[in-house]
């Protein structure tokens, strides 16, 4: 409680306020303020600065890792795009090679078919020539036989 001696120093206007206060305005108040300031300085030096520095270091670490991750993601995206372009180019080249091989095979097949047709045509002409030759030989043989038979028939009819 506030003693009567402390009222003498303060005007009567502050008396109701002072009666409600739980501590005296004496030498302990500045001592408590100094203790609070010393505690604040000690906590700042031992706790808040290292904690703040650790948080700053962690923030810098996260920021650095995030930046590196973004750079790696960008590099990976660029590589993926490059590989996709190379793959598309390779596919176009492969398709062109396939089409070229297909055209070459078609050309070879057409040439072989033409050669086979020519060979077949030559065989056919050769066979036709043989048939014509045999026909001529047969006709000549028959003409010889017809004239011989005609003479025999004429001789039998006249006889």
From Swiss-Prot:
Entry-linked InterPro entries: ATP_synth_b, ATP_synth_b/b'su_bac/chlpt, ATP_synthase_B_chain
UniProt KW Transferase keyword: no
GO cellular component, one term: plasma membrane-derived thylakoid membrane
Residues that span the membrane, as ranges: 27-47
The keyword Metal-binding is assigned to this record: no
Compartment(s) of residence: Cellular thylakoid membrane
GO terms assigned for molecular function: proton-transporting ATP synthase activity, rotational mechanism; proton-transporting ATPase activity, rotational mechanism
Keywords: ATP synthesis, CF(0), Hydrogen ion transport, Ion transport, Membrane, Thylakoid, Transmembrane, Transmembrane helix, Transport
Domain of life according to the entry: Bacteria
Topology versus the membrane: Single-pass membrane protein
Membership in a protein family: Belongs to the ATPase B chain family.
Biological role: F(1)F(0) ATP synthase produces ATP from ADP in the presence of a proton or sodium gradient. F-type ATPases consist of two structural domains, F(1) containing the extramembraneous catalytic core and F(0) containing the membrane proton channel, linked together by a central stalk and a peripheral stalk. During catalysis, ATP synthesis in the catalytic domain of F(1) is coupled via a rotary mechanism of the central stalk subunits to proton translocation. Component of the F(0) channel, it forms part of the peripheral stalk, linking F(1) to F(0). The b'-subunit is a diverged and duplicated form of b found in plants and photosynthetic bacteria.
Subunit description: F-type ATPases have 2 components, F(1) - the catalytic core - and F(0) - the membrane proton channel. F(1) has five subunits: alpha(3), beta(3), gamma(1), delta(1), epsilon(1). F(0) has four main subunits: a(1), b(1), b'(1) and c(10-14). The alpha and beta chains form an alternating ring which encloses part of the gamma chain. F(1) is attached to F(0) by a central stalk formed by the gamma and epsilon chains, while a peripheral stalk is formed by the delta, b and b' chains.
Protein name, per record: ATP synthase subunit b'
Source species: Synechococcus sp. (strain PCC 6716)
Encoding gene (name): atpF2
């Amino acid at each position: 409680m506030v003693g009567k001696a402390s009222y003498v120093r303060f005007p009567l206007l502050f008396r109701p306020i002072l009666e409600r206060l739980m501590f005296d305005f004496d030498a302990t108040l500045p001592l408590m303020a100094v203790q609070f300031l010393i505690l604040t300085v000690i906590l700042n030096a031992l706790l808040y600065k290292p904690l703040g520095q650790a948080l700053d270091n962690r923030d810098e670490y996260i920021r650095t890792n995030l930046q590196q991750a973004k750079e790696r993601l960008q590099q990976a995206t660029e590589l993926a795009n490059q590989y996709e372009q190379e793959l598309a180019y390779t596919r176009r080249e492969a398709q062109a090679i396939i089409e070229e091989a297909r055209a070459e095979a078609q050309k070879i097949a057409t040439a072989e078919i033409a050669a086979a047709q020519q060979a077949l045509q030559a065989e056919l002409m050769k066979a036709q020539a043989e048939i014509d030759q045999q026909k001529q030989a047969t006709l000549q043989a028959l003409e010889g036989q017809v004239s011989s038979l005609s003479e025999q028939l004429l001789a039998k009819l006249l006889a």
